[in-house]
C-alpha cells in the first residue's frame, strides 16, 4: 500500500515536471505552439503564404523551365520550349513551402511538404499533363515536419531539408533514401537553408536569434547571434565569399565575409567575427509623379543574380501606414576588389497587386532576369540588360545589347537598361 502511494506521488511529480519543461520550451520557442499551417506561413519566403494563390516558385538551374506551387497544393511546370504544362498532384503534397530542382539533372524536382519531402521524377520528353503519383519518391524522417526549406548541393549529390520543429537539418542521399541528421542543439529548429553557389558553405537560419553557417566538407559550423530577432533571409555571392542576410524586426541588410582556408586550416568556416551593415532600408517618403509615396521597411526575402551584379530585396510595407506598400528594391552590386551595393530603383505592381516571391533566372544571357510572383496570381519577368563585368564584351554568351534610339521607339517601348 505504501509503495502504491509512493508511485502515485512520484507520477504526479514526474507529470508536473514534464508540464514545466514543456512550458519552458514553449516560452523559449513560441513557434512550437503554432499549427503546421501557421508555422509554414511564419517562416515562408512568400509574403502571404496562407492567402496568396502562389506559394512557391523555382527556376530550373540550367534551362528556361520553372515550377509554381499553388494554393490548392498542385504544382505546374512551365517550359518555354513546350506547350505542355504538367500538373503534379500527390496525396502527401500538402502545404508546399519550398521547391528546388536538382542541379545537373533535367527532371528531378524536390518539394517541401507538410509531412515529407517529395521528389518528382519528370520525363522531359513526355507529353503527359498529369504524371502519376508513382513518379514521386517520398523522403520522410520522424519528427521532421513540416518541412519549410530545401537546398541542393550545386553538384546535385546531396539534398538538405529543414523543419522549424527539428534541431537537426537532414542531409539526404537521394539514391538510397537515407539521411544523416546534422544535429546542433539550441535555436529551436531550422527555418531556412541557402547553399552557396560554389558549394562550400550552407546558411542555416533558426527560429531564435542565432543562425549558423556550415562548411560543406567536414560539416563543422560557426554560429552568429543576432540582437533583435531571427535571421529572416539570406543569399550568397557567386563565389561563396560573402553572405548578405536580414533580421526580423530590422530594416537593414547585413554582410558577412568569409576566407578560404587550405591545409591544416581546411574544414573551418572562416567567417568574419562581426557582420557589417551595407544598406539601411528604413521607411522614407518619396515624391513621385503620382504623389507622395512611403517606401521602406523590413526585408522579407532577398535574391542575388548569378553574375553577382544585381540584388533584389522584397521589402514589406508597414501595416500601420496605409500609404506604405510592399515593393521590390533592386541594387547594383560588386563583390571585388571591394564590395559595393548601389540602389537602382523599385518595382511596384498594378493597383492592388503586391509582390509575394522573387527569383532570378539562373542563366539569362544578357544581364539579369528577375521573376516576380504577385498577390493577384500573375507572374512577371523583368529584364535588366547589361554587360557583365565578369566577362569580356566580346563573349558570345554575354554579348552587349544595343539600346534603341529615341527615333525608332518610344520611351514606353524601350527595354529597361540598368547599365549600358
Language-model features: locations:
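WD40-repeat beta-propeller superdomains and closely related acidic/aromatic-rich repeat-like regions
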Residues: 1-420
